[in-house]
């Protein structure tokens, strides 16, 4: 699993290469017949990976907030790169004395701040249960555009899904 981020970077680089001049174009961009349900190219795989494994980030009246579960990592770093990228890095090393084993884990995640958010105002907090929260306050002018209203909930009194027994009951009564 450690090589997965490197694999995605390689895939992105390959996607930028000229497509027709490569003898491997068909291999990387045209799926075999048996893979009808699989993504069509590396960009789709990268988008799927981003959507599937991206931590929940929210933008609300308090600002931009990103949460990560890092309870298994002891060495944590949060850095700001290029005034718009937040880099989160975590390491964990464990040594078992009984069996002489050693395990090491490392992650590196990059997040691009939404446009207009100031990187120098990034703050991070770590809760006692291992949740890292990265926050950035809303830039001036954004708070006026974020409107909140409460929506009333109307109860229908009917089930959303019809039970499987209803068709049998009707057939039995006929």
From Swiss-Prot:
Pfam families: HSP20 (PF00011)
UniProt-listed GO biological process terms: chaperone-mediated protein folding; determination of adult lifespan; protein refolding; response to heat; response to oxidative stress
GO MF annotation list: identical protein binding; unfolded protein binding
Gene name of the record: Hsp22
Protein's name according to its UniProt entry: Heat shock protein 22
Gene3D superfamilies the UniProt entry points to: 2.60.40.790
Keyword Phosphoprotein tagged: yes
Region Disordered: start-end pairs: 152-174
Record GO cellular component, one term: cytoplasm
Phosphothreonine: residues carrying this PTM: 152
């Amino acid at each position: 699993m450690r090589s997965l981020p490197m694999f995605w970077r390689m895939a992105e680089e390959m996607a930028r290469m000229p497509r027709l001049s490569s003898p491997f174009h068909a291999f990387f961009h045209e799926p075999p017949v048996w893979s009808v349900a699989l993504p069509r190219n590396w960009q789709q795989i990268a988008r799927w990976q981003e959507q599937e494994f991206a931590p929940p980030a929210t933008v609300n009246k308090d600002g931009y907030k990103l949460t990560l579960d890092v309870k298994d990592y002891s060495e944590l770093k949060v850095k700001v790169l290029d005034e718009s990228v937040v880099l989160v890095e975590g390491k964990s090393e464990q040594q078992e004395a009984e069996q002489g084993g050693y395990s090491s884990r490392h992650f590196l995640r990059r997040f691009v701040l939404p446009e207009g958010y100031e990187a120098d105002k990034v703050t991070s907090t770590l809760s006692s249960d291992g949740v890292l929260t990265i926050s950035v306050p809303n830039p001036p002018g954004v708070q006026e555009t974020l409107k909140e209203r409460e929506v009333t909930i109307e109860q229908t009194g009917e089930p959303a899904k019809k039970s499987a027994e209803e068709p049998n009951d009707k057939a039995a009564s006929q």
